[in-house]
C-alpha cells in the first residue's frame, strides 16, 4: 500500500529546501517546484505511475514531462515548473499494466509496456504545441513485432530502438530501425544465453552508445551495455545481424548478483554505474548498494568500487550528467551521487518523495528525468503523482541572443555576448533540417569563455543551414537560442541579422 497519497495535496509555487525540509518532504540541496496528484494528470485513485522521460520542443524550447502510468502515458507542460499544465494522455494500447517504459527520438516518443499484446506505440510530440484543453490522443504509428516488453532504449545517434524483456529474442535485444519514426521496422534479435536467469539472454535494461572510450578496438562502434539479471553484458552491435549464441558479446561482468537491473555510462565511457534491484530486498546488504564498474577494457569489466547509501531503500534507475548520478531509490526518493572522485563517491543532494519511511519496499519513486536544459528534474511517485524539483544553485538561464553574418562565400560567423568564468562555454549545434533537436549527432563546436564568436567554414552555399546555441556552465546546459536559418552566400550590402527573443521589444 502507499500511505502518502492521501496526505499530499497538489502544490504550485516553489517550496525551498530549508533545514532539511521542503514542506513535508525531507531534502538536501534540492527545492520542490511543484507537485501534481495522479488524478490531475489522467489517472484515478487506482492508477499508478512508473517510468518518465522528457522532451524539449526544438522550436519553442518548451519542456514537457512524458509520464508513464498504468493506464497509458500522460503529457505535462513543465516549461513553468511552478505551474505545470496537463495537456492530455495517450491511452495504453491494450490493457493496464504496472510497467511502462518510454524514450524519445526525433520529436516522437516510443512506448512499450508489459501489458499483453501491447507492442510499441509511436506518438508525434509536436502535437502538444497547440493544446488548449486536455486531449485524449491516438498513435501516430504502431509496431507489432513484439507484444509485451519491459523496457526500451533508443540510441539517438544511430536511429535504433532496443526493446528488452519481450517474449521474442530470448528476452534479449529486439532491435527496431526507427530512423523514420513513423515507419518502424525490425532489424534483428541479439542475445547471449550465458546471461539471464533462464539462460536465454534476457535483458532487463540496456544502454547503447557510439563508443568513444579508452578501448581503442571499439571506438566509433555501437556498443551496448546490458543489465541482464545475472550479469553486466557488453556487446558489439555495430552490425545488426541475428545472434542468439553470444557471438557478439565482448565481455561479461560477474558479481554476487541478486538482480542486475539497470545501469548508465559515465560520459567518458570509462564506468558503468549499476543498480541491483533485489539485493536490499534479499537482506544481502543493510543499505542501498550501487556498483561502479570499470569498463575501460570492454572485454574485462571489473568493479571499481561499491557505494552504500544512507538508507535501506531499493535502488531503481540511474542517469548521469557530468560528475553527478541521479538515482531513483524507491522509498528514499531522488538521490544525487557525486562521482568526481570515482573511487570515493559521496551523496551531494536528495529529495524524498515518500515521507512515510525509507523501508526496503517498492513504494515511492520509480524514475527521474534530469536532462532538461533548464536543469529541473521530473520525478514520478508511484502512488502519488508528478514532482518537479530543482537542485539549488541551478539558475534557469536565458537563451543566448546570437548575431550572424556571411563574411565570405561558404562561411558563417556567429557572435554573442557571454558573461561567465572558466566553467562557461557556448555550445553550437548545426543541422540542415529546420526545427532540429540539438544533440550529439548535430553538435558542431564549443567555444570556451571569454570567446564570443565562431566561424563555420567550407559550407555549401547553395543550401540553408540551421543553428542553435546554448550556454553551458559547470556541465549544465541552459536553454537553446532561437533557431538561426542562413544560406552562406554573400549578398550585396548584406547586413548582419540579429535574432531577438519574442519577448524583447
Question: Which residues make up each language-model segment?
Answer:
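Short beta-strand/loop motifs in extracellular/secreted proteins, especially
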Residues: 74, 424-427
